[in-house]
Curated annotation (Swiss-Prot):
Substrate binds at R18, W19, H33, D69, D77, L78, P79, T80, D137. Belongs to the 5DNU family. Catalyzes the strictly specific dephosphorylation of 2'-deoxyribonucleoside 5'-monophosphates. CDD domains: HDc. This is 5'-deoxynucleotidase VP0926. Keywords: Cytoplasm, Hydrolase, Metal-binding, Nucleotide-binding. One of its GO terms (cellular component) is cytoplasm. It is an enzyme of class 3 (hydrolase).
């Protein structure tokens, strides 16, 4: 049996800092972020199913969200302003991400690659599932901005404005429900939510 370095690589998600160009009151790594995105994506799928007639699989979507940034163990976390500086850079970076996804998948024993492919290869997942994960990813970035701003860190003011626009562009009934129901608490202190 051949050794696999797959999970050793995934364990390094905790070493990759998000928001690398920003001063943060509370630093965040890719592992923490992925778990929060999984929580939110799962909730968005449940909200869509229960409130807006969806037929999604919330558990599959949560799993997809857990792995959504896993290729960053090979690429690092490129800051959003750099990644989307212009369409050419964004297009080339997508190619780099795809190559990293395939490299990560190839680290698994062959008998498990088919099982992991839908979660590791961004082009393999259902479009609707991917959209929910993208929505959750944007919401989590927005919530991070709320937390930082609430702690007095104005470094995140511009990022929040940018995310206000992104959330408006991606707006769905389930996102609106989530944001109205859960987001205000992120601006409160522990005493206020206890």
């Amino acid at each position: 049996m051949k050794e696999s370095h797959f999970f050793a690589h995934l364990a390094r998600m905790k070493l990759i800092q998000r928001w690398p160009l920003m001063r943060s009151v509370s630093p965040e790594n890719v592992s923490e972020h992925s778990l929060q995105v999984a929580f939110v994506a799962h909730a968005l799928a449940l909200i869509k199913n229960k409130k807006f007639g969806g037929t999604l699989n919330p558990e599959r979507i949560a799993l997809l969200a857990m792995y959504h940034d896993s290729s960053e163990v090979l690429t690092g976390d490129l800051p959003t302003p750099v990644k989307y500086y212009n369409p050419e850079i964004a297009k080339e970076y997508k190619k780099i991400e795809a190559a990293a996804e395939h490299k990560l998948l190839s680290m698994l024993p062959e008998e498990f690659q088919e099982d992991f492919a839908p979660f590791l290869l961004s082009h393999s997942s259902h479009e609707e599932d991917s959209q929910i994960v993208k929505q959750a990813d944007s919401i989590c970035a927005y919530l991070k901005c709320l937390e930082e701003l609430s702690a007095g860190n104005h470094e995140f003011a511009l990022a929040k404005k940018r995310l206000d626009v992104t959330l408006q562009e991606r707006k769905t009934p389930e996102m609106e429900y989530f944001l109205n129901t859960f987001a205000p608490s992120f601006e409160l202190s522990l005493d206020e939510i206890s």
